[in-house]
Amino acid sequence: GYNAGKLQRFGYMSVKSVKNTMLADKNQSFRAHEFHYWNSDCPGSDYEVIKASDNSTASAGYGSDTLYAGFPHIYFYGNENVAERFMDACMKYKKNSRQEAELIPELDKIKGINRDAVMKAKAHWNGIAKPLHGLGLMEEIITQIAGIQNTVDVHIDKRAVIVMCADNGIVEEGITQTGQDVTAVVSCNMADGISSVCRMAACSKTDVIPVNIGIAADKLADGTDVGTYKDLVNRRVMTGTRNFLKEPAMSQEQLIQAVHEGIKQVEWCSEQGYNILATGEMGIGNTTTSTALASILLNLEPEAVTGRGAGLDDSGLKRKVEVIAKAKEMYGRYADNPLKLLQSIGGLDIAGLVGVYIGGAVYGIPVVADGVIATVAALIAVKLQPEINDYIIVSHQGKEPAMKVLLDSLGKKAVIHAELALGEGTGAVMMFPLLDMALQVYRENTTFDDIQIAAYEDYGKC
């Protein structure tokens, strides 16, 4: 935002919601007015504003099931339906928050990041001898990490990617190319250090921590025991989820246990001195579970958010869309209750990753999100406790169609746009070398004071 220099008056207007939001359903309108001293280059696009005086239109505002933010000022007098929806949303949020805090008491331990450290890190960036905001998102992320770590002396040298491995009962419905045995094989390959993410992690000095949170197989084809496999952390809650078209994927107790296993994994990482983490996953069928969650949480048509996963043909994609549409029909009523929805159709890998994000916020460790599965988990964690969003760093906008709308819902921008679809945390691990380079500039670069040149003035428009 920036100071407009004078009072901006737009008068009375009609505001039409372009999607379902807390204040109105899609295409419903309500009255508002607008005046402000500050302006923004990013005023939002979730509402269409129609000016009463001349019928001119513009896009403005941000809206979701729990948020309204924007320049149009809403007044409840004469907008009784909007007022009623607002109060209903408040009461529902209060009820859900109370239930969630009882099930996951760690949510009440989360505090906001250190804003003083954020401001000092911004000031440090502005003092470096380079164009203002020249490193773009990388500057913002290093600044964010300063706020998380409560210091301008940022450290990201001890790092790990936590890969939650689990099977999904929905594979019974023919929505994948391969069977569940692949999950166990790839998970053990990670433990052996020979999977894709391991090769990439070696380049960035990142430890790989594969976690068995719900692998279906007890043994590999050669008889090797999966539960005791060396360097595969055993936190198994159940032997894969159930087919959610027949019954809920897991019980509430199993869901909460999986979330807590993720929190405990971050607690262990904190004790070992890790100062930044990444999220990854492995589980046949998990693009179906994650896309179904995204479709319901964001109220989007299955066709708009469903991708081919690990390479489905046209008939396989059609079947996957049908399964997700059926999930929405069966469980769409839980759109405002993320834990119940996750219990009903989610995977144990997603539940464990929700715990990782919660743990990152509890223990003050930044967490880099990977692709669509990890980002759905991030959205659920943020719905449980909005402060968690400040602890999450986005790595890439993957190939799955749901990725962009998920990132938009979190208010985040991806650094990497490379149509990634590998999983395992590979996209998140790719972020670490980029962060290293940005941090080197942050720490070591010449400042304007060093060369006795006046710094650029920040007008807030870069």
Predicted regions: what they are:
Residues G1, F35, H73, E424:
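Hydrophobic, well-ordered secondary-structure elements that form the walls
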Residues A32-F35, L67-P72, V163-M164:
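Short hydrophobic-aromatic micro-motifs
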Residues G1-M22:
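Cysteine-nucleophile active-site neighborhood
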Residues K26, I74, G78, V368, ...:
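Hydrophobic transmembrane alpha-helical segments of multi-pass transport and channel proteins
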Residues R98-C462:
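N-terminal loops that bind phosphate or other acidic moieties
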Residues M22, N39-C42, Y75-Y77, N168-E172, ...:
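Short, acidic Gly/Pro/Ser/Thr-rich loop/turn segments
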